[in-house]
Regions:
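Polybasic, proline/glycine-rich intrinsically disordered low-complexity segments
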Residues: 66-99
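Short, extreme N-terminal segment that most often corresponds to the first beta-strand
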Residues: 1-15
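Phosphate/anion-contacting hairpin/loop surfaces
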Residues: 18-33
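Short, surface-exposed beta-strand/loop "edge" segments at domain boundaries and coil↔beta transitions
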Residues: 11-19, 48-49, 75-80, 99
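Generic N-terminal initiation segments characterized by hydrophobic and/or small/turn-forming residues
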Residues: 10, 27, 31, 67, ...
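Acidic, low-complexity, intrinsically disordered interaction modules
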Residues: 36-79
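Generic beta-strand hydrophobic packing signal
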Residues: 7, 23, 94-96
């Protein structure tokens, strides 16, 4: 299964005894993931809007073989309703593979 969200925690793991591989990817690779089938669990409304998704606060449970794409916000607290990132902030595209 493929998931797309803005955060990843160990609480998402169905089995805590797995290996995880993560790496920064390009926005082109992130955008390519948006073209296929995926489960949107984007919990932050403004980050979701910035990557072209709707907010969808759901619980997920990932297992071996699943892939999670993230738009990870890095910066000062994002003001509610933001449509652009504040100075010094970035969105980092990441790919997390549960092995």
């Amino acid at each position: 299964m493929i998931y797309i969200g803005n955060v990843f925690t160990f609480g998402f793991l169905a089995n805590k005894n797995v290996d995880i591989k993560s790496r920064e990817i390009t926005w082109a690779e992130f955008d390519q993931a948006l073209q296929g089938e995926f489960i949107n669990y984007m919990g932050h409304e403004d980050v979701a809007r910035m990557v072209g998704l709707e907010q969808n606060r759901i619980s997920i449970s990932v297992k071996s073989g699943d892939i999670v794409y993230l738009a990870q916000y890095d910066g000062p607290r994002l003001e509610e309703g933001a449509t652009v990132l504040p100075q010094g902030a970035t969105l980092v595209p990441l790919k997390v593979e549960v092995l």
